[in-house]
């Protein structure tokens, strides 16, 4: 595990502020938005569809804290781009938007360095003000939209209106208090992690923040490598994973197979009270990865000789299956959902940090074993040569 302190020179212009929103392309945006609201505690924020004059794509925008998800579906049968994307990837993340300053400068620099500009900068406006956008291509079929608000005061973005329907169930459910996006993880095919992470360093002037390799993260069967890149202010963190060769198919390779290539593996959502958050998410019916009791026995033993004092009750953490990782400075608490759709691709993480800026490397081996148990149930913990997603099936 390596932490990098050299951020490189501070960019003169074109600051990346924070994650703006995450856009999902799904088969049924209305149902997907309802699922995230009912199960994860989001609330409807905005809408764009036939009723607002959007004739091709419907978008349901949901929000919790500062976390914004946009669920999009095609309205017409001839939308080949979205149709092909769904056949290949299934429901999942299409775009990760960053709020920025000086969008034009960022695009100009990215273009000079060889980045693919999917859409050149353009401006949209309504009665609440103007917003400038641009779209860049990153790994797989994933894109990054740059969002520069020009005195914009609307609820989301131009073209969106208030939700058309108020779900009377949502106020009766326990609040989950998820606050911000902590990080977003991208999975790559083997040998593509370096080039994917280098894209951010070269084109967006991000820097390496953290890394781990397969000598540190492995089980009897499988392993991974990971590099985390971040913007200068480190308000945006993007781990990039790849599978490493092992005896069996790793959960990273399983993702790549079912996603049809690289894509967003999981989104980590931060809370300041993970115990209450997870209690309420479980009450709402969310499913999480199981953790064996042996993990907590070993954790209790190791913490006896650690300088770190975990404030939370260990019995409660064990009851809720929340993981703990720590170093000499602090600790973090984390838990992972099961996949959010039928394909074993995208899932979510809930994380709470106590003076700890890592990514749970101490839990990677335990997590891999938990993932492998789920893989085995799906029939996917197999020799690499004998199993895969077969075309035409």
Swiss-Prot record:
Q: Which residues bind Fe cation?
A: 183, 266, 349
Q: Which residues carry this modification: Phosphoserine?
A: 211, 226, 250
**UniProt domain VOC: residue ranges:** 18-149, 180-338
List residues modified as N-acetylthreonine.
Answer: 2
Q: How is the cofactor bound?
A: Binds 1 Fe cation per subunit.
- Any one GO cellular component localisation term in the record: Golgi membrane
- In which pathway does this enzyme or protein participate? Amino-acid degradation; L-phenylalanine degradation; acetoacetate and fumarate from L-phenylalanine: step 3/6
N6-succinyllysine is found on 132
Its Enzyme Commission number(s) read: 1.13.11.27
A molecular function (GO) held by this record is: 4-hydroxyphenylpyruvate dioxygenase activity
Annotated catalysed reactions: 3-(4-hydroxyphenyl)pyruvate + O2 = homogentisate + CO2
Keyword Transcription regulation in record: no
- Keyword Iron annotated: yes
* Pfam families, sorted: Glyoxalase
**Membrane topology category:** Peripheral membrane protein
Q: Which cofactor does it need?
A: Fe cation
- Cellular compartment(s): Cytoplasm; Endoplasmic reticulum membrane; Golgi apparatus membrane
Annotated GO biological processes are: L-phenylalanine catabolic process; tyrosine catabolic process
Q: Keywords on this record? A: Acetylation, Cytoplasm, Dioxygenase, Endoplasmic reticulum, Golgi apparatus, Iron, Membrane, Metal-binding, Oxidoreductase, Phenylalanine catabolism, Phosphoprotein, Repeat, Tyrosine catabolism
Instruction: Show the PANTHER family listed in the entry.
Output: 4-HYDROXYPHENYLPYRUVATE DIOXYGENASE
Q: What does this protein do?
A: Catalyzes the conversion of 4-hydroxyphenylpyruvic acid to homogentisic acid, one of the steps in tyrosine catabolism.
Query: Hey, which family's this protein in?
Result: Belongs to the 4HPPD family.
Q: Which NCBIfam families match?
A: 4HPPD (TIGR01263)
Task: Indicate the quaternary assembly.
Answer: Homodimer.
Output this protein's name: 4-hydroxyphenylpyruvate dioxygenase
